[in-house]
């Protein structure tokens, strides 16, 4: 159960795959008034949401605020024992769930809480390696590859032309200094103008992917020597950390207090996974981070 956003789908489906479950995905829709009410003030009643699930199920994996009440409702009203797992802080009594999976930077404590370094996701190294050839024919094999993974505007980070140009300028200095080729990978949130500006700025010698393309994303992760991710997406930074390759974070000035994102990035800096994008690229390595499988093993152990 999710609100349908990529970062949430990646987490629930990643955990379902790691638990070796057959699954179906349900995008939760709350009825008008309840969209604006925090879970702790919402009744656990059917009139809160629109979804009707007729398929049989044994486990619920939910992520995001809107899926909290439906998860509890379906568990309580089932004719059989249902295990429910919520990803992220549900901001309601943790006793409503069998497991709550939350990042360390949320600082959530409880007997049924499993803390993670960063976000869960659905990528595997096997899948990344299998898709390497997808972009291989479009790159200059004599050059090392640097990739830029773009997020998109949020209430904390604005994708203004000025903010994006600063990132492109910093990237360009590194590209010229080290004679690199760039691959730009957009996400669902990336504005069209940001991609258009990349094409104008970097020109035909670099590869700018126009649309969301999972195969291109996986291929780029495989081909990259250096990875750059915009600071607005903890999910994409977590996904990139599976590779064990150097990850640089492209900063955007925050328009609101982004302390949770900063805590996440500080943790990843301590783990030697990320550094801030500057004009001097270094090569380093770290222990590949695969929290999805670690969490799945912990859940399996507790369930058995």
Protein language model regions, located:
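Leloir-type glycosyltransferase catalytic cores
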Residues: 265-304
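A nucleotide-sugar donor-handling region in carbohydrate enzymes
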Residues: 94-160, 277, 283-289, 293
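Active-site and donor-binding regions of nucleotide-sugar-utilizing enzymes
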Residues: 5-121, 128
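Catalytic donor nucleotide-activated moiety binding site of glycosyltransferases and closely related
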Residues: 179-213
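Conserved catalytic-core segment of nucleotide-activated headgroup transferases in glycan assembly
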Residues: 153-185
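Short internal beta-strands
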Residues: 26-27, 101-102, 182-188, 248
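A donor-sugar binding/catalytic signature common to diverse glycosyltransferases
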Residues: 3-8, 217-258
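Short, aromatic/basic amphipathic alpha-helical patches
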Residues: 13-16, 73-75, 99, 193-202, ...
């Amino acid at each position: 159960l999710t609100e349908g956003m990529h970062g949430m789908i990646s987490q629930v489906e990643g955990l379902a795959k790691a638990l070796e479950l057959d699954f179906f995905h349900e995008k939760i829709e709350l009825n008008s008034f309840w969209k604006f009410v925090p879970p702790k003030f919402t009744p656990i009643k059917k009139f809160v949401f629109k979804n009707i699930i007729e398929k049989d199920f044994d486990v619920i994996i939910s992520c995001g605020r809107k899926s909290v009440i439906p998860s509890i409702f379906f568990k309580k009203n089932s004719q059989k024992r249902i295990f429910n797992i919520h990803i992220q802080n549900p901001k309601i009594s943790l006793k409503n769930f069998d497991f709550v999976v939350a990042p360390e930077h949320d600082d959530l404590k409880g007997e049924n809480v499993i803390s993670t370094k960063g976000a869960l996701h659905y990528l595997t190294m096997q899948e990344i390696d299998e898709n390497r050839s997808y972009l291989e024919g479009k790159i200059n094999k004599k050059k090392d590859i640097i990739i830029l993974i773009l997020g998109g505007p949020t209430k904390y980070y604005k994708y203004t032309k000025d903010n994006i140009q600063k990132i492109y300028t910093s990237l360009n200095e590194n590209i010229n200094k080290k004679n690199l080729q760039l691959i730009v990978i957009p996400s669902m949130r990336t504005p069209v103008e940001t991609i258009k500006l990349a094409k104008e700025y970097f020109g035909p010698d670099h590869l700018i992917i126009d649309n969301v393309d999972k195969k291109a994303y996986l291929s780029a992760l495989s081909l990259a020597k250096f990875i750059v991710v915009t600071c607005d997406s903890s999910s994409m930074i977590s996904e990139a950390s599976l590779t064990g390759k150097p990850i640089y974070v492209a900063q955007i000035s925050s328009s609101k207090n982004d302390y949770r994102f900063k805590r996440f990035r500080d943790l990843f800096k301590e783990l030697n996974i990320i550094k801030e994008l500057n004009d001097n690229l270094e090569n380093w390595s770290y222990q590949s981070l695969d929290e999805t499988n670690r969490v799945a093993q912990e859940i399996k152990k507790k369930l058995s």
